[in-house]
Amino acid sequence: MKKFLAFVLAVLTVVIMPLEISALETVEKENEFVTLPEKVNELTPLRTRKKVEGLRMYVDEENPLFIIRNCPIYTGDLSAQTFASAAIKTYFALPQDVRNFAVIYIDEGTTYMTPQEQLDFWDELLYLTDEAGVPIVCQSECFCTNKQRDPFTEEQLSGIFERHTSFMGFVQVELSTNGVTNEKLAYDEVTEDNGVNKNILARLKSCIRACKSNGGLFIWQDMEYIYWKKANYVNFILQDKELYNLLKSCTENVIIMDKHNGHGRHFASQSNIMGCWLDDVCGNWGVNLENFLWYEEGFKEYDDIGVAPNEPDFAYTSKYPPALYGIDMIADLVGGATVYAIEGTFGRGGLYYWVNGEVVMTATFNDVLYPFYQLVIGGAVPDKEQVKEKIKVAYKMTSPATYALSGNDAHILQGLYCDSFNFFHENFDVRSNPYNDCTKTWVPSTGRYFIVPILPIHSKPKEVLPDSYVLNDFTYFIRLLFIEPIKQIFFNQKYKKTYEGDGVLFDINDYIYIFNSNENKTINSNQTVKYTLPESGIELRTNFVAHTYAIFDESEDKISIDLCNLRLDTDDVCAGRENEDQFMASFAAGGKMSDPQNFRQSVIELSGFEAEPVVRAEGSNGAKLRKEWNEATKTLTVTTISNGEVRITIE
């Protein structure tokens, strides 16, 4: 898949639009650090989304979707015209290669408008985006709507599609915050409290039907909490057979996204949603990144376990390193995720800021998101069959509350690539315990076990994963006896070790991804990886500190490396010496990236060359690089000191 797309893009470059791509500068000096030339983001060869009859927007691994919220507006005129203008400006601020696969997400009004006010707001906004040709999705339900306002009818939702060519679909988010109750799960009875329809299922189904009948997208973003009524949430709701069948009947319209928020259970959330995709409950799955996670998990400063969930000041969300967004996306891309979104405080996660009435992208976009989006556009996302080949073990849900799937995170995942939690952590709510109702972890600790999917209750595992060992409640007990060492032996037999070291490595679809798994620890955070590159046989060794990742691509006797470790200077805003606007104004102008502590060393060692290779490189934010060649061992060592992105080619 990747090689085919690469060929197509190469032809497009030559035939359709002769882009001038700047070559990386050759590093001539040996054994001393040199400052790299400033990298320049160039457009990839332009292509457009595939059109499919009956669908307003088709999405797959070759046609990804980047969901971009409009640059935020918090004060002044908050009319539909203002938000339409912001949406249009945000859309056209995106580089054209990304813009061709993007949609603007409007979430305004959900928490305070009545249904009729919301419909009028959408109409007023969408008439303007229709004229501008800007694709839009709108949020129809969120964490509080089922408690605060009456539901939309299917006819009302369909009317939005019928009246607006720029409208692509509806988004529903964070339904898990309401929990579930068994007695309300299996039917659509309308329950009312002060005139408000509280039945989430009915709202889901009417929206899905409206999207299905109008060729629109139905996007469901959700997460999990440790409380049992909010665990395995997506598959918990899919016990409803009518909902399950409805989603499968319009799978190409449906996107389910792992919302990186909530208290703990981030790995179970990923497994449940990926399992839905494997079972064709949704045609695509993805991830919604957010720096709120720092707040939800109770983190404050680095190297501090923090406090209970939701206790830090919102200012501490700025501590979420932009490089972690890249790591989060990689952890889902390898599992076939095709849809990516970002939100949060500080310019929607530090993404952009208003400067003289225009949207200016920050280094979070330029050094992290944009290179990643270009990678995805270029064909990096594996298709479903490639993903299935990596899955040796899966789990078929029979009950959402079973032991294997319960806990601070699903017990089946604990001790594999997810932390283990003791009896005290999982059974006692002590407010002084910083682990109370959270896990403090969301980055996988190893790539050995890939991702263990959790299949829906109504799935047929032999049809979904015929070549995988699919556990269920009965076999989990019989084979593993709920004993951690036995489980470890079982998984080690199924997943052979492919690399050495305590870092994380994934190799799929001709790309190799390596990252450090520490979320909050920065002191003594080094992690190493040793791996043999499959095409050249070159032995690769890396030594990365926290908040560092690299993407390796072997092709045509060349190794391309994209390394990123961006972290921001946040001391002033966290101490209250500046506010969010002041912080973002500085960041958008190129500031907040100069703290010497954030310039960290990364080491990449490659052995097995026949002769000394040529090294070319460029970087952002004053990155430095040193190359060392050992003629006796035919080993090249590349060391960078950086806080941003570094691009290296070795040939």
What is each of the regions a protein language model found here?
Residues 1-4:
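Positively charged n-region of N-terminal signal peptides that target proteins for export
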Residues 8:
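Conserved, function-critical positions that sit in or immediately flank catalytic
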Residues 13, 18-135, 159, 551-554, ...:
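Mature N-terminal, pre-catalytic/accessory segment of carbohydrate-active enzymes
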Residues 22, 393-398, 559-565:
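Short, hydrophobic/proline-enriched secondary-structure or compact coil segments at domain edges
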Residues 30-503:
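Glycan-processing catalytic domains of CAZymes
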Residues 412-651:
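C-terminal beta-sandwich/jelly-roll accessory domains of carbohydrate-active enzymes
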